[in-house]
Amino acid sequence: MSLLTSYEGLRHQIERLVRENEELKKLVRLIRENQELKSAIKTQAGGLCISGFTGGLGEAAAGPPQHQGVFLPPASAAAKEPCSEDLGMVALAPLADMLNTPQLSPAAGSLVNPLAATLNPLLSGQIPLLQNNQFANLVPCSMSNQLTNPTTVSPGVTLASSLGLPSTGPLNSQMTSPMTVPPGTTLASSLGLTSTGSLTTSSRLVGPLAVSQSSPIMAPLAGTVAVSLSSPLLSSTATPLGVAQNVVPNPINNIGQPETPRVRRAEPTRGNFSGTSAYAGPAPTSKVNDTRGSRVMEQSRKNVVEMERKTPHRKSNKLPDNPRDTKQLVCERLVGEIAFQLDRRILSSIFPERVRLYGFTVSNIPEKIIQASLNPSNHKLDEDLCQTLTQRYVSIMNKLQSLGYNGRVHPALTEQLVNEYGILRERPELAASEGGCYTVDFLQRVLLETVHPSKLTDALLLLSCLHQLSHDDGKPMFIW
């Protein structure tokens, strides 16, 4: 009668677990669908942002020439892009043509006249310049033009990148007054000048330099401007990129201090391009730059080598060379093997038809009985199979309880011992295992020498349970 009562209670528990399992499956499906929806929304939003940004840059950079030496966007494009002039994408006539050519087309004159009052102060007096415009650096220019007089530039910007103005004719005028370049834009962007010829200025930069470093987008005084060569801004131009020399002016001692470059600069291009200015590549950096760069690379290589050296060292510590330590390690794994073999023996007696018991533990036997009893085609419970498995479970648990095994305490302790001590990595020799090498007395001595006193009593109980099960089925205690 007590067996029927326990069977009914177990059956109700199994049905309850089935319902909980179905609810958990539904919850997991909802969570997965929610995560997939979030991922799809993020991917779609990111794609829209990137495509819109690159499309806007492509439209701003595209401007067909309408007059010789003057590049003006179409009226429709100007209407759609009202900020193109602010971005410096509207290019005006070359600097020399503005000053020397008395006649311009009506379209060009309308744009040049408002700048006439600005061009003369540019060459004779102080001019305010901003360096917030990034498009001026995209204009290819010759690196040989330098100033003869004191200038005030922002960090990371040289005169070549500030002017950035290859012109259709030679520019021989020299700047005879100091220039003030506040942070915000470059000279090319403030003038809006683009050219199709070469810029030839033979003067050299010999005056004092004052640096303004209040621009939020520029690097500090001791650093340089980091330029990404894979940026869509660079890909929008059809001409090679001229990277300025990596020299930061020093306002104290008037000496250009080279800094370690942060980007790989473009190789110098041989020859001239038709319709564009001649590109004379960046000046070679000093030996200090090479030394610092090589020092950083060498330090990185040392870190990688050190990491590779430490990794096998940690792995080798798991297998000590000392024979005494090796014996201790084997004894610890024998403790875990005893607990593992007891779990495996219990599961094999309940599920003898299963070869692999991955995911099966004594703690989840009721749940595994339900899973094994469900028909995979119609998901109906096979009551006969469920009853058979339940009887096996009740029989072996009653046998172990007579030895002192507690179904609420010892399954968790078994898992703890396996996780703490591990199991044997390799199968012992077949003759040794069958010849009685792992006897009860030997394994008891191992437990006494290895297990902590707080767990020793339970560990000895697990060993006695394993010995009883092996005696009942006539097999060795360690089944491989």
Swiss-Prot record:
Entry keywords, A to Z: Coiled coil, Cytoplasm, Cytoskeleton
GO molecular function, one term: gamma-tubulin binding
Record flagged with keyword Cytoplasm: yes
Any Gene Ontology CC annotation: centrosome
Disulphide-bridged cysteine pairs: none
Effect noted on mutating residue 469 to P: Abolishes CDC20 binding
Top-level taxon: Eukaryota
Region of interest: Necessary for targeting to centrosomes: 1-76
Localization: Cytoplasm; Cytoplasm, Cytoskeleton, Microtubule organizing center, Centrosome
Coiled coil: 2-45
Region spans: Disordered: 252-297, 305-324
InterPro entries with a match to the protein in the record: SPATC1, Speriolin_C, Speriolin_N
Organs and tissues of expression: Expressed in testis. Expressed in pachyten spermatocytes, spermatids and epididymal sperm (at protein level).
The keyword Cytoplasm is assigned to this record: yes
Family per similarity comment: Belongs to the speriolin family.
Summary of subunit composition and partner proteins: Found in a complex with CDC20, CDC27 and TUBG1. Interacts with CDC20.
Protein name, UniProt field: Speriolin
